């Protein structure tokens, strides 16, 4: 089945990790086929939180990345709920384990891409959004920025990149306590090949994978529910560059790549709101 964040978000009563019992300790690892992240490897990774009515806690709903001391890049579908206000969200930065000494940042503005649109099988286009924090963050080894690509950067099929998050470790299998951030290496899959896979599985004749989408992953190596909005990064000339934003997929870790918003398609839009220096 398709994994769509809106099916698991706390305001719909879905399954979301909550604050761990201090007595629980599990060593199982995930994203899908992933490993625990060493400290300070991905200092731009953030957790987007929503105040769950049932738990009374700020629950993790999506990932995101810090691209400016006061701005977070995430997926539009993470913040697509009609009437959702910035004041109902929080962002946690510099954390490897969810809910471990939370110091949540207030969100003051949500900017969804105006072309964002949902279809029955996923998202047609522009699954990208910006969140403005209440105040600029002080950068450090634990909290830092990821570089964005230039709009002309070409990410070749077969290139190995990394996706990170606190999402499910398999279909309907949440990341267990202590909710340690996961990473997995995934190969880039060309849009034509990716589109053929999805046309077949979804029985669609129309184009499924648009030009502003990017595919990555292989059997047993994938992002999953609750990873949405998180970064797909590639090592480029000794610099980590964010090339994708986790968007949607069919199952988790099957022999189908995950689908990401292609960051190069939206760098110019991002610059309209945030003054940034492009990467390679």
UniProtKB/Swiss-Prot annotation:
Keywords: Cytoplasm, Disulfide bond, Glycoprotein, Hydrolase, Protease, Serine protease, Signal, Zymogen. It comes from the Eukaryota. It is an enzyme of class 3 (hydrolase). The active site is at residues 77, 127, 228. It is found in: Cytoplasm. One of its GO terms (biological process) is proteolysis. Oligomer; disulfide-linked. This is Mastin. It comes from Canis lupus familiaris (Dog).
């Amino acid at each position: 089945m398709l994994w769509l964040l809106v099916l698991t978000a706390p305001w719909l009563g879905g399954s979301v990790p909550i604050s761990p019992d201090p007595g629980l300790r599990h060593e199982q690892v995930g994203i899908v086929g992933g490993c625990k992240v060493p400290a300070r490897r991905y200092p731009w990774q953030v957790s987007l939180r929503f105040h769950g009515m049932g738990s009374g806690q700020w629950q993790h709903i999506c990932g995101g990345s810090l691209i400016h001391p006061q701005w977070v890049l995430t997926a539009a579908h993470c913040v697509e709920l009609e009437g959702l206000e910035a004041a109902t969200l929080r962002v946690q930065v510099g954390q490897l384990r969810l809910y471990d000494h939370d110091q949540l940042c207030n969100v003051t503005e949500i900017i969804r891409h105006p072309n964002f649109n949902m279809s029955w099988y996923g998202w047609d286009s522009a699954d990208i959004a910006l969140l403005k924090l209440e105040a600029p963050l002080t950068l450090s080894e634990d909290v830092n920025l990821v570089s964005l690509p230039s709009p002309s950067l070409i990410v070749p099929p077969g290139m190995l990149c990394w996706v990170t998050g606190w999402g499910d470790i398999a279909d309907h299998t949440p990341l267990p306590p202590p909710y340690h951030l996961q990473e997995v290496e995934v190969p880039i899959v060309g849009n034509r090949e990716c589109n053929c896979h999805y046309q077949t599985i979804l029985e669609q004749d129309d184009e499924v994978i648009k030009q502003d989408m990017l595919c990555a992953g292989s059997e047993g190596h994938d992002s999953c529910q609750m990873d949405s909005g998180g970064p797909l990064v590639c090592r480029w000339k000794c610099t980590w560059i964010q090339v994708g934003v986790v968007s949607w997929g069919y199952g988790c870790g099957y022999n189908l790549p995950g689908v990401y918003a292609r960051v190069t398609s939206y760098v110019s839009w991002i610059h309209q709101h945030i003054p940034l220096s492009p990467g390679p």
